[in-house]
Amino acid sequence: MVSPILQLTNISKSFGHVQANKNINLTINKGTIHGIIGENGAGKSTLMSIVYGLYQADSGTIKVNEKEIKLKSPRDSIENGIGMVHQHFMLVENFTVLENIVLGFEGELVFGKNLIRAYF
């Protein structure tokens, strides 16, 4: 039997009086591909933002490789092997390509220095 790589259990998130996610359960096994579909406002982006650490769930648990984790930031997600490609690229319009890349980089400073050296 394949072990779950990601488990969401009873994930809920509200913004004021608006319930964006209510008791969401999702299990993803290693080597599988899933899509999340729904109408506008159904809570898809909110759920993915919780998994990526941009939002914190009001309740529920998240497990990666059967270990319960707390995702307080995107860095926590990345450290647990979770990445996210945004539907709409979040670029700063008046920045250069290099500046946008460096802005989004969350790794060691060495990478940024090497990137700048390669660019110039």
Across the structure, where does each feature detected by a protein language model lie?
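Glycine-rich phosphate-binding loops of nucleotide-dependent enzymes
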Residues: M1-F120
